């Protein structure tokens, strides 16, 4: 079903499809079409069909897609048909917002610990957690074989934190710091920098 040769831009659209389909289910809809899905997302129906065809045939011409079935298939493709344990590094304002966000678990991700190297923060409550020191994080990652981390530290601390995560066994990092990390080729990094998105939008604003 899954091909490692699928372009990143296509993989990046799959979560958008999954989210839109989940909204359809919550509205009581059972069947959809590439045109319906495309209108919700601002993506052409041809592009949606092309994207999905990279992974198999999920619908029939004239009858559309069974939404529940397509959701199940997309979850398998994205490997979110299970719960992933995640560590959060950084307990500043951004880290606190991330720790308190309730939408992770319902979409396949469970934060299992929050860590910070500031002695004044260690031991303090944050969301449902108590902030722990980084040495405990390394132990936890190795012990529970955790593969995903979220990095919400200042730019100056991001590279060292990433190196520690990789050393402990993390294979994927979601980085909120406005910097570029140097990691091994087999470690996946995704960046979230709101300023970059704002700068992209202002290009289109006269």
Regions found by a protein language model. Name each.
Residues 91:
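Glycine-rich Rossmann-fold phosphate-binding loop(s) that bind the pyrophosphate
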Residues 94:
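Hydrophobic/small residue at the entry helix of a nucleotide-binding pocket
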Residues 22-25, 129-206:
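Phosphate-bearing ligand-interacting subdomains
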Residues 31, 35, 40-83:
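HTH-adjacent hinge/linker in prokaryotic transcriptional regulators
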């Amino acid at each position: 079903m899954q091909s490692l040769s699928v372009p990143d831009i296509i993989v990046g659209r799959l979560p958008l499809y999954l989210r839109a389909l989940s909204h359809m289910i919550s509205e009581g809809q059972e069947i959809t079409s590439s045109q319906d899905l495309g209108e919700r997302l601002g993506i052409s129906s041809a592009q949606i069909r092309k994207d999905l065809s990279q992974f198999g045939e999920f619908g029939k011409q004239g009858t559309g897609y069974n939404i529940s079935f397509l959701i199940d298939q997309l979850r398998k493709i994205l490997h979110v048909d299970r719960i992933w344990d995640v560590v959060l590094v950084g307990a500043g304002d951004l880290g606190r917002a991330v720790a308190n966000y309730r939408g992770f678990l319902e979409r396949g991700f469970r934060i299992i610990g929050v860590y910070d190297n500031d002695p004044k923060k260690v031991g303090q409550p944050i969301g449902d957690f108590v902030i722990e020191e980084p040495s405990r994080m390394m132990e936890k990652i190795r012990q529970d074989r955790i593969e995903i981390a979220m990095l919400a530290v200042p730019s100056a601390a991001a590279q060292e934190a990433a190196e520690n995560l990789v050393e402990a066994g993390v294979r994927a990092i979601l980085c909120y710091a406005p910097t570029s990390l140097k990691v091994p080729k087999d470690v996946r990094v995704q960046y979230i920098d709101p300023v970059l998105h704002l700068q992209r939008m202002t290009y289109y604003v006269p």
